[in-house]
A protein has these predicted regions:
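HotDog/MaoC-like acyl-thioester-processing domains
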Residues: 1-19, 110-158
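Phosphate-handling active-site elements
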Residues: 91-97, 125-126
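Short, conserved secondary-structure segments in the cores of folded domains
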Residues: 69, 103-106, 110
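Short alpha-helix capping/helix-loop boundary micro-motifs
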Residues: 1, 99-105
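Conserved short hydrophobic patches within well-ordered secondary structure
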Residues: 87-88, 109-111
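Hot-dog-fold acyl-thioester-processing enzymes
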Residues: 2-94, 158
Length: 158
């Protein structure tokens, strides 16, 4: 499959993804207080000792390093969506993504650029339809594995 490139990663990009996705624990003001009050232990004290959301690892370097990450990093579900983006670009409007399974292997911190490559590993027919299995992986600019996956797509027969 043609290579797809994502990045370089930025904190703005991480926040934009959270805005579109909805952010699992991101709340403000009264809603944040209600959430932390309802779910004890969810609010992790920030530098002002105010309970704040755990998703700060995606935009706050100091907090990210406290949990063992190299710095602020991307969202795992976004990486999974990149893998489906990669294959759906290739199969086009007439193809259908049947399944996609991914395994996340490392953080993508701010500054990383990700290169997604894929290979057709199987072709088969079922009930008169044509299918392909694609194995793909994403690596950063240093060649470190970020995520890998296997997808199956139904393609129109010629």
């Amino acid at each position: 499959l043609p290579r797809m490139v994502k990045g370089p990663m930025t904190v703005t990009g991480f926040i934009a993804y959270a805005q579109g996705w909805g952010g699992l624990y991101i709340r403000a003001n009264k809603l944040a207080w209600k959430q932390v009050s309802k779910h004890k232990g969810l609010g992790i004290p920030n530098r002002f000792n105010i309970p704040d959301c755990p998703e700060r690892v995606h935009w706050e370097n100091e907090f990210a390093t406290k949990v063992g990450a190299p710095g602020a990093y991307d969202y795992g579900p976004e990486r999974c969506s990149w893998m489906t983006h990669h294959i759906t670009n290739w199969i086009g409007d007439d193809g259908f993504l049947v399944s996609s399974n991914t395994k996340i292997r490392r953080h993508n911190p701010e500054g990383d650029t990700i290169f997604i490559d894929g290979t057709i590993t199987d072709k088969f027919e079922k009930d008169g339809d044509g299918f392909v299995e694609v194995t793909h992986e994403a690596r950063n600019q240093d060649g470190e594995l970020s995520i890998l996956g296997i997808a199956v797509a139904r393609l129109p027969k010629k």
